[in-house]
Amino acid sequence: MHHIVSIRDLWFRYRGSDEWTLRDIDLDIERGEFVVITGRSGCGKTTLCRCLNGLIPQFYEGELKGSVTVAGLDVTRIPVARIASIVGMVFQNPSSQLFMLTVERDVAFGPENLGLPKDEILRRVNWALDMLGISDLRFRSPHELSGGQQQRVAIAAILAMQPQIIVLDEPTAYLDPYTSLSIFNLLKELNTKLCLTVILVEHKLELVASLADRVIVMDKGCIVLDGSPREIFVKDLSVYGLKPPSIPRLFLKLSGYG
């Protein structure tokens, strides 16, 4: 294994702001890791994700110090369109990423923009739809699907680009617990089958505790905790505005720390 993401002494503040949104971030992520990033609202999670695919500083302007390297490339120097074939990003609201008339067209959009031959585009579309279990939705309009189905389509559209990393910013924010768990299990399956590096921003720690290889807790723009779920979830996370999964919470109470 080697570092697919390497961040050194990263600081960032948005244009017009005196406050640093990210402060002194040092982070290495290995190829094939399933990493959960969590923390209270406004702690810098989304901003960190934007740094991974070049949206910062190439789209969101501001002052950036330090370095962000993904798959050996400096994201501040590589066009966002090229980075998109390496780092795929899925947002909270899947409908914001789906704008074609059919599921098939949405999934084909990325590979088409890579300039791939038609037969390769078709192969990738078929593969991505099959991997996500949504081949039966191929000719449906994305906007008549359920939230869970839409999120699967959004993930399939990213997967068709065959990225090395998929970054998901609270992808189940609008989904019920059952549908959320199905999405998380799907991500773990893709992580295992494809050795796909998964970076998941999430508050639903109860649902992802058993899936993550690693949990990163952010607070006030900094990484304050970084370790395995076993190491992180037995700590008192309430100081960071978080609740650990129920079993570690019970352990804390029995140990006199909760």
Regions found by a protein language model. Name each.
Residues E61-L73:
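Conserved ABC transporter NBD signature motif
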Residues S141-L145, Q149:
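Conserved ABC ATPase signature
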Residues K220-G221:
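Conserved ABC ATPase "signature" C-loop
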